[in-house]
Amino acid sequence: MEQQQSKNNAHVSKLFVCTAVDCKDDIEEKFERSFVTLQMQISGLSDKEMHDMLSQAVCKDKQHEEISIGFLYIMLTDPSMAPKTYRDVTLVSRDGMNGIVTNLTFLVAEKYTKLTEVARRQLIWLLREFVKHQVLSVENVIWNCLRQAGGGDVSSRNLFLIESLLDIFIEFRTWLEGNPFLVQSTVYSFVRLIEDHANPALMSLRQKEVKFTISLIRERFHDIIPLGRDFVRLLQNVARIPEFEQLWRDILFNPKILNQTFNGIWQLLHIRTSRRFLQCRLLPEMERKISFLASSVKFGNQKRYQDWFQEKYFATPESHSLRSDLIRFIINVIHPTNDMLCSDIIPRWAIIGWLISSCTNPIASANAKLSLFYDWLFFDPAKDNIMNIEPGILVMYHSIRNHPFVSSTLLDFLCRITKNFFVKHEDKIRIGVYNSLKLILEKQVIPNLQPLFESPKLDRELRNLIRDNFREFLSPPANLGQLLYPSTHTVQGHILKKESDQRILHCENADLHETGLINISGTVISVVDEDKKISLVPTDQEIESVFSDGTAENLRRVHNIDENTDDDDDLPLSKVRLKEKPRVELADAIAESFESFVSKRNSYTWEAFLKDFRPLPASAFEEFQLNYVISNTVLILRETLPQQNIFSESKTDEKHLAKSISYPLYGLFRFLYENDEKSKKPFQILLSEICERIPEIGYLLLYFMKIYCKLQTRKNSQQSYQFKTTIYRQICDAADEKIANCLLRDLDMLEKENTNIFLWLLPDIYREFKSIATNNTDLLRITLRCIDARNVRDILYSVAQGKLTIFKQDGLIDCIRESLEFETYEQFCLWQIVQAHDVPLRCIQDLLPELEAGSHPEALSHFLLLLKNEEPTNEIIRLMLSREPKSKGDPFVTSALRFWCQRYEEKLSEIIASLLTSKYPSSSPNKRKRPPKGISVSTSIPSADQVLNHLEHYRRSCRHGTGTGLYVHDMMQRALQSAYSHSNDSTKKQFSDLFALAAEEDTTVGRRGGSGRGRKQPGSKKDVNNHGTSKKTAEMVKTIYSSDENSSEEDWSKSKITQTAKRRKKANNDSD
């Protein structure tokens, strides 16, 4: 007897509440074993001896975990020793108490309901210490504690937890506001909990909750906006409280007072609430049970599970409010796969039908119906998921024959809520409901609506109401043929294209969708009318019918699946549902490490599993085993990524940087970085699946390598850590894509996710992926679209310091040619970066003939500035004069010639004259020289007409004799004479004013051995005759330009040309 008594005493746990029939599970044994081991090690030792011994012991991973759990056990079970133990653990912990926080998080999530009263109170004390000392990841413990603060529960135990968490949040408000996701979870949870605390005995707690919540909402409203439509639904239930009533008025009528970026209630209603917030309002145990019901219970066998659930969670009057939370969770989180749709598992609509029909509280019943149809009210087929509206139509469709009262009340509610939900914007609500019904018919969720809308089991008033609201759906479409009523044995099945695999337990602020509105104090309301009053909609009658086993048996064969329908992107259930799946026996080599990873979900266990998994050949797995491993690992990798702030807030602080790459996915990158050997096929399959299901993996890898190399180099300055592009190539190979395509896609996604991190990584990208990134127009466009003036400045600094090279000379012209279609601001930024690279003009000058004044003003502006710093050369002038002249001239060419004339007049005149003369060779005066084979006259070499056109437009710009010196030089004179003599009558007439600047050809031939008028003599540079001739010519040119203002350029007469020529001839004779 004594032995039996001692055995029973030994079984009693200080941490967990155990009955005589309870057996210890692995978690309980692990905690108590660690406590006993720690006691044996430190028993009888002084503080100094204990610290020395433990400091050596914690160097081993296994002992470190045991010691951490042992200390945690003491702090949770012994209030008197807790402060000293906390000091001890801070001295010996080598991971910043990460092990303790991880185990405490798991303990709260899995075993909170079994903790003793002392342990619960010590948990609050320990949380307060963690928050006070800023222990990393304590927000995970807080979030799991918030989940344990259940709705619909006013027991003293639950109220103690709620008030304790509230006190921590109030005391450490600054710490709370530093974590936006925790702010969102806290506000969402307390707005929901305040609804349950209407009892006068709880008035002091309720007032404290209201004061804190309202203050947090108003001060951090920019963090509250992502809570979206379901936050509005919760606000509706507390709108009668004065503080919330004033908040409602500000949201509706003065939104800018809350936040300058907030545009009103519709902005919230267009945002889909993250699944994680919907999840946080269910107890973890309740979530596991409802997920098990929806994934493992066969249709027809569910009654005993429903009865147990009803007795467990709906036993008190306050618990009815839980039904709305459950329905929103089922609709938005539990999206069954195709395999489940094909099976005889109980469908979602049947569970929701049971939750609504078994509700005996009219207020909770109205709220439950609103939860069912909530996503209908603002449904947008282009954005929203049909799986969120499917249960509503199916529960009505399948109930119409045997439970018409269920269908009738739901139809009546849908008709009334469409009209009265938001009176001011009834048209928009109606569009959302119409979109829902239209997509339901298109996707064949049900064959047609006539069996439901025109059922003889509906009363006349309801049929009239349906006719008024859904007239468009009453006439059957021609292609549907005869009306089909749902059978009691089989119904039309469907496969729907669901959302791509999204992060189930994380915020989805980048993927926001539309929905609908509200519920207050248990009564459905219309938000506002013109008098700013809240109008009430009468609630429905209590529903008495329930879903019986008989009906379920008749409807057991529910889904007939079209095998040709593509539905590979089904959204999996949440992680808790995976725990309910039967375990698969795995090879001994990975069984232990895989189980450790699944339970702990950290980088250390993940890398240990990878080390065991990588060398295994394909023969080590059956197909189902490999699929089991891959599906679980991919899901865990996604779920353990942070929902917000995935990147470090600081680019210099080592703690922030290290924390940002501490998640299991980064463990994969670290493993690949440190292990270069070739992988076996199973590992390659795993890598491919990760790449497919986690699209962000590419840019997260780039981010990891930047930080990892930075941190490792700081730790060991003797060794250089390289940015290994081979790892990125592995990822690209696993995704079966070219590295260039992957890089551009990943950088595009990264820029949209976080512009600062994208620009931070940019120098590394251009350095490590030089062959792909340099002169890459697509990457350049991604960069230019996101930068502002400060970013341009930083890029220029990096280029000037040699840290960043965006362009190389070879091929640059093609890059700039493609950039001509960019936006104006982007092009101006581009030209600044080009200029910072000191690109010589010769590399891009071939673009000059292609640029058009109307289409490419940015490029022409920059080219003009470049030309001002260049001397005119034969090549540049050739390209400029190859530009196609317009009827009104080319201001670009004219501007360039004008400023060159100020410094290089003679040189410019000689170059143009030489170019013009080359068109009229002396050997063939009547034929123009043909261009070399393969060179286009119009683009490479300017034609004579192009040169003359540009000279003519330049002449017109030279008013009052300014800039006319270009034409007085000897070579230009001879070139114009040659052009005149070789031109036809049409050309001579067109350029008559230009040709008038040169003497006629016969005046240039004298009797002194062909020495022409005005030519320089070989032996005398300052010949008097030449000086006189130049002076006379200059005066003549000035006379021509002066007379040009008073005469029409188009009406030059032949007689005027002759008179001018005679005056020039007389002047020449006088000079001779």
From Swiss-Prot:
**Which residues in this protein are found as Phosphoserine?**
S1042, S1043, S1047, S1048
| Identification of the protein by name | Integrator complex subunit 3 homolog
GO annotations of cellular component type:
cytoplasm; nucleus
Question: InterPro entries from the xrefs?
Answer: HEAT_Ints3_C (IPR056518), INTS3 (IPR045334), INTS3_N (IPR019333)
Q: State the UniProt keywords alphabetically.
A: Cytoplasm, Nucleus, Phosphoprotein
Residue ranges of region Disordered?
Answer: 920-941, 1002-1072
What's this protein's function? Component of the integrator complex, a multiprotein complex that terminates RNA polymerase II (Pol II) transcription in the promoter-proximal region of genes. The integrator complex provides a quality checkpoint during transcription elongation by driving premature transcription termination of transcripts that are unfavorably configured for transcriptional elongation: the complex terminates transcription by (1) catalyzing dephosphorylation of the C-terminal domain (CTD) of Pol II subunit Polr2A/Rbp1 and Spt5, and (2) degrading the exiting nascent RNA transcript via endonuclease activity.
Subcellular location per the Swiss-Prot or TrEMBL entry: Nucleus; Cytoplasm
Tell me the organism. Drosophila erecta
* Cross-referenced PANTHER family: INTEGRATOR COMPLEX SUBUNIT 3
- Please indicate which superkingdom the organism of origin belongs to: Eukaryota
Main location class: nucleus
